[in-house]
Amino acid sequence: MAAAQEADGAGSAVVAAGGGSSGQVTSNGSVGRDPPAETQPQNPPPQPAPNAWQVIKGVLFRIFIIWAISSWFRRGPAPQDQAGPGGAPRVASRNLFPKDTLMNLHVYISEHEHFTDFNATSALFWEQQDLVYGDWTSGENSDGCYEHFAELDIPQSVQQNGSIYIHVYFTKSGFHPDPRQKALYRRLATVHMSRMINKYKRRRFQKTKNLLTGETEADPEMIKRAEDYGPVEVISHWHPNITINIVDDHTPWVKGSVPPPLDQYVKFDAVSGDYYPIIYFNDYWNLQKDYYPINESLASLPLRVSFCPLSLWRWQLYAAQSAKSPWNFLGDELYEQSDEEQDSVKVALLETNPYLLALTIIVSIVHSVFEFLAFKNDIQFWNSRQSLEGLSVRSVFFGVFQSFVVLLYILDNETNFVVQVSVFIGVLIDLWKITKVMDVRLDREHKVAGLLPRPTFQDKSTYVESSTKVYDDMAFRYLSWILFPLLGCYAVYSLLYLEHKGWYSWVLSMLYGFLLTFGFITMTPQLFINYKLKSVAHLPWRMLTYKALNTFIDDLFAFVIKMPVMYRIGCLRDDVVFFIYLYQRWIYRVDPTRVNEFGMSGEAPTAAAPVAEAPPAAGALSSAPSPTTTTEAAREEASTPPPSQAPQGPSSASEPQEAPPKPAEDKKRD
């Protein structure tokens, strides 16, 4: 189930990234003692992987980037005796706009990436005079921020998937950004930055239909576009908010020593060596769900541009968050999924109580430790396991079948490469477990197609000769009475009410959906074996404890971060199964000093086992019995009939004595 849940989360991310919804538009805000190996049995099938945990791992990765950048700043500026290209020492630069510089803001909107038409009044979107560099108290809300809203009349080229750019110029007071106005233009008094404000996103279309009727609920226009442009179409999308930040920073940067990703924003003048004020286009809080496609039905587009000062520390945070993923070589599909994961993080930051969010991040670190320990104990358990008593071997085979179904499903749905690799590794681990629960040999006499050796599978003797196989077969026979009718009902429902690409896709999606919904039932055979054996001594409780704790942490994530209802129900039902394990541990208590039904004990073996004491020989000296021993002996003598008179002699000491009967509690356990 772990791989199934992971692929389900990744698949939904890809579908969501495919199209933008014209939902409600929001304004762009600034947010601001370990048992021996032979006593450890098989664990139940893997639990569903927490999709929310993937989100938290993304947060931790970004925290690491921020820490790395902050660590660089704590080192102080680079030494000034570094040699430059010409052999001259590099010196620290300064900001071309000193503190409290009076400046003007000019914002132009254009279809062209390089803007030159300063005389076109239609291109001028916003002009703000007399701004003070480093002023944090002006503006409508006394926070140094200003904003401007207007409707943009878009040309036909933009309606037909063209690009649109925003060009921002900051000039010192009294100067103009147009280089053709020689008297009013100064190169060192003008800073310019431009950016494409529309965003191209992939919209995927899968041609599906009802396999019985041949009908589909897809939009006819979408079907036509899929026939014209193929299953993947790149469409321009729009978000009406963008923030222009000017960083209030006067750090003596040294050219060539600015660390990434900050180096792409710090621009140096080639002549003076000083750097221009840092302009940053901030769209971090623009959620993907608020983007909508641009088409010919839109004659105008709303645009709200905000201007705010930004501190150096917050700029480092935004730059680290916006840095490109190191996995960009894996394809653009990973970018789209990364955008969706970042949206989950942003929603959690905006909608979750800060204390609860901090607690969640702390617990997530504990989750990662438990996840690693559970995986390590699982591998160690199967690698060192010699006996299969008490283990459900059929559950291992069912896990392999389940992993193969998930792998074929994600391949059929073209999930991104990272998920495919992770699921494939899970399949290899499940296949390796088969070699630990069965004797696998290669028959080189009867080859497949006369070329490849034929693999043969045979049950291990420790499994066949024990009662575990009988109980395992019985458990799966009872389980089939439930699973097969449910599978048939789900197959009929999927065929009647759902759409599919073809019969192959229907089989995979039906099996995949069935495993997601009812796969937890396959955890019950181990419970049944425990019940029939009246023992849990064979279970690896350390690994089960790690998995149980992780499941409870999953519950926290599922209710803190937005998750589908079925995922939350899945976490709850896994909790129920673990509580049943705990209940069995309570009613089938294990005495660590008692040898269980498999001939194993929880105590470490000693060099010499204790033997029954023989009666002392005649004339031998013995110590006086303690009062407790005397009392117990008196009680035993009173509760047993007097033995028949036997001749006393030295030979009686060597006769074997009958072992005392087991207590009633031990009989009940047996």
Curated annotation (Swiss-Prot):
Localization in the cell: Membrane
Keyword set includes Glycoprotein: yes
A Gene Ontology BP annotation from the UniProt entry: regulation of T cell differentiation in thymus
Principal place of residence: membrane
Residues modified as N-acetylalanine: A2
Keywords: Acetylation, Developmental protein, Differentiation, Glycoprotein, Membrane, Phosphoprotein, Transmembrane, Transmembrane helix
Topological domains, Extracellular: 2-354, 412-416, 499-502
Low complexity: bias regions: 1-16, 609-632, 646-657
Database matches in InterPro entries: CLPTM1 (IPR008429)
Family: Belongs to the CLPTM1 family.
Protein's name in the database: Putative lipid scramblase CLPTM1
Origin species: Bos taurus
